[in-house]
């Protein structure tokens, strides 16, 4: 494979940095959504395997998935810009793309603010930058409206389950923790050393969360918590909800929908107090 890559590199050794941005590749679902929001939809030529929004993204060639990046295909497609996800794309493969001279925009999202910033920064590569600037402005305006609406929600201790075999959750500052925090959520596993720790049912029972959230596609055993209704306040009080995984787990303008969904659930708890 490396011999083939080297041959391709020699063929395309001209500098890509100085070329106008006409051909764009996205390596993550959220990056694809951000690209469309930034006005780059007409320039996208390939995306990641799970890029399914907006609808037009489904028709594009696929060059990456959870296993890695198809370097040979990307080199053949000769993109002017690659939108990468440093938290999800293999670092060594991104380094190789850099060595080949490709221009890479790293879509880092550690805060809700970063979503608007990513849209705005990528808009410079659009033929009509105003599209991205308008979408970034609309996102920020809507975010502040939600902040004003839900700023007085009380603190609620929650548990967010990403999968059931094993049970995986989120810790620390890792996405989508900020969505829950925006709504007054306090992660019961916030202090875990791993970013996405594996936990046990016993640990969840001991943490006594007031609310529990799951993603429908990640939960295969719908009855796994049934025996523990009396031990976990969230279950005893029927504060157990499914969330739209795409809204929540992808840092895009649709995160606003996730915020409203989570905040409304926390608000319903407050109404019962």
From Swiss-Prot:
Pfam families, alphabetized: Peripla_BP_2
Alphabetical list of Gene3D superfamilies matching this protein: Nitrogenase molybdenum iron protein domain
Keyword 4Fe-4S: no
Subunit structure as annotated in this protein's UniProt entry: The complex is composed of two ATP-binding proteins (BtuD), two transmembrane proteins (BtuC) and a solute-binding protein (BtuF).
UniProt signal peptide: 1-18
Site description Important for BtuC binding, residues in chain: 72, 202
Stored InterPro entries: ABC_Transporter_SBP, ABC_transptr_periplasmic_BD, ABC_transptr_vit_B12-bd, Vit_B12_bind_prot
Function: Part of the ABC transporter complex BtuCDF involved in vitamin B12 import. Binds vitamin B12 and delivers it to the periplasmic surface of BtuC.
Superkingdom of this protein's organism: Bacteria
Sequence similarity: Belongs to the BtuF family.
Alphabetic keyword roster: Disulfide bond, Periplasm, Signal, Transport
Subcellular location: Periplasm
Protein name, per record: Vitamin B12-binding protein
Domain Fe/B12 periplasmic-binding: 23-273
Organism: Vibrio vulnificus (strain CMCP6)
GO terms for cellular component: periplasmic space
Disulfide-bonded cysteines: 183-263
GO molecular function: cobalamin binding
One Gene Ontology biological process: cobalamin transport
Chief place where the protein resides: periplasm
């Amino acid at each position: 494979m490396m011999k083939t890559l080297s041959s391709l590199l020699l063929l395309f050794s001209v500098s890509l940095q100085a070329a106008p941005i006409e051909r764009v590749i996205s390596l993550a679902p959220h990056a694809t959504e951000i690209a469309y929001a930034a006005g780059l939809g007409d320039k996208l030529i390939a995306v990641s395997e799970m890029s399914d929004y907006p609808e037009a993204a489904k028709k594009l060639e696929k060059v990456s998935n959870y296993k890695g990046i198809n370097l040979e295909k990307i080199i053949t497609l000769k993109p002017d810009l690659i939108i990468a996800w440093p938290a999800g794309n293999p670092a060594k493969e991104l380094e190789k793309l850099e060595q080949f001279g490709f221009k890479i925009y790293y879509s880092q999202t550690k805060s809700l603010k970063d979503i608007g910033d990513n849209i705005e920064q990528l808009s410079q590569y659009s033929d009509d930058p105003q599209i991205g600037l308008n979408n970034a402005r609309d996102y920020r305006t809507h975010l502040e409206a939600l902040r004003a609406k839900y700023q007085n929600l009380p603190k609620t201790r929650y548990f967010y389950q990403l999968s059931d075999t094993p049970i995986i959750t989120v810790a620390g500052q890792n996405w989508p923790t900020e969505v829950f925090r925006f709504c007054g959520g306090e992660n019961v596993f916030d202090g875990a050393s791993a970013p996405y720790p594996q936990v046990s049912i016993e640990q969840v029972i001991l943490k006594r969360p007031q609310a529990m959230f799951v993603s429908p596609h990640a939960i295969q055993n719908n009855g796994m918590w049934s025996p523990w209704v009396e031990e976990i306040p969230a279950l005893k009080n029927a504060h157990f909800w499914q969330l739209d995984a795409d809204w929540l787990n992808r840092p895009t303008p649709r995160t606003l929908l996730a915020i409203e969904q989570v905040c409304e659930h926390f608000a319903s708890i407050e109404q019962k107090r």
